[in-house]
Curated annotation (Swiss-Prot):
Residues binding S-adenosyl-L-methionine: 27, 29, 54, 75, 100, 125
A GO cellular component annotation in the UniProt record: cytosol
EC primary class: transferase
Functional summary from the UniProt entry: Specifically dimethylates two adjacent adenosines (A1518 and A1519) in the loop of a conserved hairpin near the 3'-end of 16S rRNA in the 30S particle. May play a critical role in biogenesis of 30S subunits.
EC annotation from Swiss-Prot or TrEMBL: 2.1.1.182
Source organism: Streptococcus agalactiae serotype Ia (strain ATCC 27591 / A909 / CDC SS700)
NCBIfam families to which the protein is assigned, alphabetical: ksgA (TIGR00755)
Family: Belongs to the class I-like SAM-binding methyltransferase superfamily. rRNA adenine N(6)-methyltransferase family. RsmA subfamily.
Protein name: Ribosomal RNA small subunit methyltransferase A
GO MF annotation terms: 16S rRNA (adenine(1518)-N(6)/adenine(1519)-N(6))-dimethyltransferase activity; RNA binding
Reaction it catalyzes: adenosine(1518)/adenosine(1519) in 16S rRNA + 4 S-adenosyl-L-methionine = N(6)-dimethyladenosine(1518)/N(6)-dimethyladenosine(1519) in 16S rRNA + 4 S-adenosyl-L-homocysteine + 4 H(+)
């Protein structure tokens, strides 16, 4: 019997006296077919290391451990650590790290894999309230993850895969699409979770590009500029840039020059700029030494 079997899940929770904490956004998956589909979507095999975020009681971890070289699972809730030690006892290729993934030094952590040079894929069922910070943390870690296969609310998946001139488009769209392609693989109904969330989820598969979608002089500055443009979505690009960089005559002259170099109108909003537009703007701002 699988951990994800509903009767097994309930028995594990009862045996350990576990109660769900809303603050951790805990929803445990109880459908083995969907778990297998996640592993198949991520194309997990013995040539891959996996980082899992939020293993819960180990339902997905069990499937990952059977297929991957190694699994490193980050769990913030210390009440789940003894449960995972119990449910995953038969595996010698799983490390459970009792830590908030947002506070983890991932560059150091991945050295704990027996073979840290294998491609690393991230597989996770992320709580809605923290999906964006976690994805940004993973991207900003500069670790060349091969793939993210992540369960999330459809609204967040729409933001990640959004195109310019849409409500969903923003700095998250740019950050992910700069490095990766993003595509919804399938829908996960709310009925297969304990407890059931309020909405259905989707599995979003993000695959690293061979090269970033555009070339920029300074990646960190490029991402900074893209974030600045969306600080106040309803404001013009000019207003957001001057709010961030300053409103002195010298600064405004440099901003005008940079926009002229990048061939971008100051009156448009950030959501109208494509990723190549943001690349041109960031490089132009560097050129004028803002």
């Amino acid at each position: 019997m699988r951990i994800a079997d509903k009767t097994v899940t309930r028995a594990i929770l009862e045996r350990h006296g576990f109660t769900f904490k809303k603050s951790f956004g805990q929803n445990f998956l109880t459908d083995t077919n969907i778990l297998q589909k996640i592993v198949d979507t991520a194309e997990i095999d013995k040539g891959v290391n996996v980082i899992e975020i939020g293993p819960g009681i180990g339902a997905l971890t069990e499937f990952l451990a059977e297929n991957a070289a190694e699994v490193m699972a980050f769990e913030i809730d210390d009440r789940l650590i003894p449960i995972l030690a119990d449910t995953l006892a038969r595996f010698d290729n799983v490390q459970v790290v009792n830590q908030d993934i947002l506070k983890a030094d991932l560059q150091t952590q991945i050295q704990a894999f027996k073979n840290p040079d294998l491609p690393i894929k991230v597989v996770a069922n992320l709580p809605y309230y923290i999906t964006t910070p976690i994805l940004m943390h993973l991207i900003e870690s500069k670790i060349p993850f091969a793939e993210f296969v992540v369960m999330m609310q459809k609204e967040v998946a729409d933001r990640i895969s959004a195109m310019p001139n849409t409500k969903a488009y923003g700095s998250l769209s740019i950050a992910v699409q700069y490095y990766m392609t993003a595509k919804v693989s399938f829908i996960v109904p709310r009925t297969v979770f304990v407890p059931a969330p309020n909405v259905d989820s989707v599995i979003l598969k993000m695959v690293r590009r061979d090269q970033p979608v555009v070339s920029v002089q300074d990646e960190d500055f490029f991402f900074r500029v893209s974030k600045v443009a969306f600080v106040h979505r309803r404001k013009t690009l000019w207003n957001n840039l001057t709010s961030h960089f300053g409103k002195s005559e010298d600064t405004k002259a440099k901003l005008e020059k940079a926009l002229e170099i990048a061939k971008i109108k100051p009156s448009i909003r950030g959501e109208a700029l494509s990723i190549p537009d943001f690349a041109s703007l960031a490089d132009a701002l560097k050129e004028v030494e803002i």
